[in-house]
């Protein structure tokens, strides 16, 4: 009876959880439908276009810079399993060279059991022993030749100076002595080599005891047939761009691509990180988001202002711009850039780096957003440029030298203050430019610099992307290379039918599951940052009843009648000015006030 009671209790809990989730989904869909009915999306078209252009330029410039700087460098394939170095199409990395060569990410070659590749190491030892033996034989032969020449000279002198038969018989005796010396040297050489071979066998026996039964099987790399190897066995195998592009997607997890240690001075990671962060901050000044994680963070912190549909459209245009830019760069320059952001082996480490970095960066951006909002509220009553329409009508010519003064009611190059204070004394600056946007940049320069150096630290030190749009663009470009450009022709139907293959579908699913931390980490970090900011948010904001009149109905006389009773919602007080500004000032869509 107790077990049945517990089972019924768990069933009731499950039903309650399902009903709660279903209710949340229904309410969310209802809000989306109301937003679609109420919102006029045409007024956001310039914002969507700006997000598309900003994302395209951001990804395009960084990709071009990195691809163009690294396209002539040699890269290295490192196989993660034990490999026989003397087989064709295999790649071998000697244990000694791993520690001597300064290459990031190099590790000892170990199999699944954690045991070193003893067969390969023994082969290298035998190779080195043979080289030493050949060198010793060469020195011994030279020594024997010198002894033989000395004996020959002594024998000829004795033949010329002596006539007796006893002296003539000494010649073969000396030859016998020389041959005995040579035989003794060879005997000593054989003894040394036998001792060395015995020691090697003893050492090999000590290793072989701990080996498993399947360690004698050879593991070949059959999917890298076009790799051009160097002559020396104990060096990394260097490859070019075309060899990387010809790899098989199925076996890609078995290898690791590294940069040659001799070319490490040509690495421009710090330069393009600085360049990318600078572009990002410049677009933040212009008012773009460029980061879907930050866009959804703004929606979470103020859902009434942005709306789920508007936020999704923002992110969609960001993704489209980034993907097109990445594919265009890969089509022009190659695909080296793709392999720098492929899924990492350490999933949790990647997720934590992306999560923590995006969490801290989103807090900075949201603080910057709140500071912008306060700046707008504090400066909303200041005088701006006033456009005098009456003077334009009375102007004789638009090409007048005083056209600016006629339009804006004062001269931009005036040395007097526009306000009648201190009897219009001269200002310190010779050019007085009363523009709130310049004031906005000057007042926010500290935040912008702080965000810039924070971005530079996260990208350069932790090697994280901080942007799911950037990671998704890279992955889509990788698939473009594998399934489109490999055929040297673009045929939509052939590409579509090639994706219907069950094997390719499974490969893509596995590939994207492994790369989930590249975009789940930023989204999770930004979501936690919004909840953290809401803990310190003032909930006592002024709420007014605002009627959204973006949707109208027409009567028989073709008069516009607002749907007053249909779309009635509560907004924050400052949103009334926001909606009026965006509706009646269409020429200022890209102004910072909108964001």
Swiss-Prot record:
Classification via Gene3D superfamilies: Glycerol uptake facilitator protein
One GO cellular component term: endomembrane system
Reaction catalysed by this enzyme: H2O(in) = H2O(out); glycerol(in) = glycerol(out)
Transmembrane segments: 47-69, 270-298, 308-333, 344-369, 435-462, 514-536
InterPro entries linked to this entry: Aquaporin-like, Aquaporin_transptr, MIP
Knocked-out gene: effects: Dramatic reduction in development of mature sporozoites in the mosquito vector with no impact on any of the preceding stages. Greatly limited parasite transmission from mosquito vector to mouse host.
GO MF, one annotated term: water channel activity
Topological category with respect to the lipid bilayer: Multi-pass membrane protein
Gene Ontology biological process terms, A to Z: development of symbiont in host
Keywords: Membrane, Transmembrane, Transmembrane helix
Protein location: Endomembrane system
Main location class: membrane
Family of the protein in this entry: Belongs to the MIP/aquaporin (TC 1.A.8) family.
Function, in words: Required for sporozoite development in the mosquito vector. Required for parasite transmission to the mammalian host.
PANTHER family associated with the record: AQUAPORIN TRANSPORTER, MIP17260P
UniProt note: domains: Aquaporins contain two tandem repeats each containing three membrane-spanning domains and a pore-forming loop. One of the two canonical Asn-Pro-Ala (NPA) motifs in the pore region, which are highly conserved in aquaporin water channels, is changed to Asn-Pro-Met (NPM).
Protein name: Aquaporin-2
Organism of derivation: Plasmodium berghei (strain Anka)
